[in-house]
Amino acid sequence: MTTHRKPSQEQGFLNGQFLLAMPGMSDERFARSVVYICAHSDEGAMGFIINQLQPVQFPDLLRQIGVIGEEDLIILPDRAQHMVVRNGGPVDRTRGFVLHSDDYMVDSTMPVSDDVCLTATVDILRAIYGGGGPERALMALGYSGWAPGQLEMEVAENGWLTCDAPLDMLFDSDIEGKYSRLMLHMGIDMSRLVSDAGHA
């Protein structure tokens, strides 16, 4: 049995937390984005935008990569039928990743926090198609990456807000409203934040 060690959250690192783009974010790709940080160290950071959608549907993606055939589309479990594909970020946009609850583990699974893991192999897609796999999961194509010190600088320059990442907020299906709900969760008045951002 493979033992997976949970990552430690060292001082100043944001593993397992959300980034919320501040109004006026200069990079349009991240405007009003919510990013879940999976890895953050002196060597840089990586995470996934979780509130942007890809145009491809999960069943079609399974068919495109050969996990299922055309004839299998009608027998997919309801969960797989309705699963959406997120735009995880601008890096490696054809590569798939699954963030999921810690009730699914294979050798390639990477623990992200106490209850969230990351798997980037086709095995987990087959498990979800078969009606198994983790209880909670989200699929993303591409990821967001930062060079050493880059994320720290962007946070210090008020490019991002940071907050804890409740599981319900990470995995729920209200993608369009996620940014606003997290702002409310943090007690932030968006109208005031936008107004303040417009002043030097």
UniProtKB/Swiss-Prot annotation:
<dbReference type="GO" id="GO:0005829">
    <property type="term" value="C:cytosol"/>
</dbReference>
<dbReference type="InterPro" id="IPR003774">
    <property type="entry name" value="AlgH-like"/>
</dbReference>
<dbReference type="Pfam" id="PF02622">
    <property type="entry name" value="DUF179"/>
</dbReference>
<protein>
    <recommendedName>
        <fullName>UPF0301 protein BCAN_A0487</fullName>
    </recommendedName>
</protein>
<comment type="similarity">
    <text>Belongs to the UPF0301 (AlgH) family.</text>
</comment>
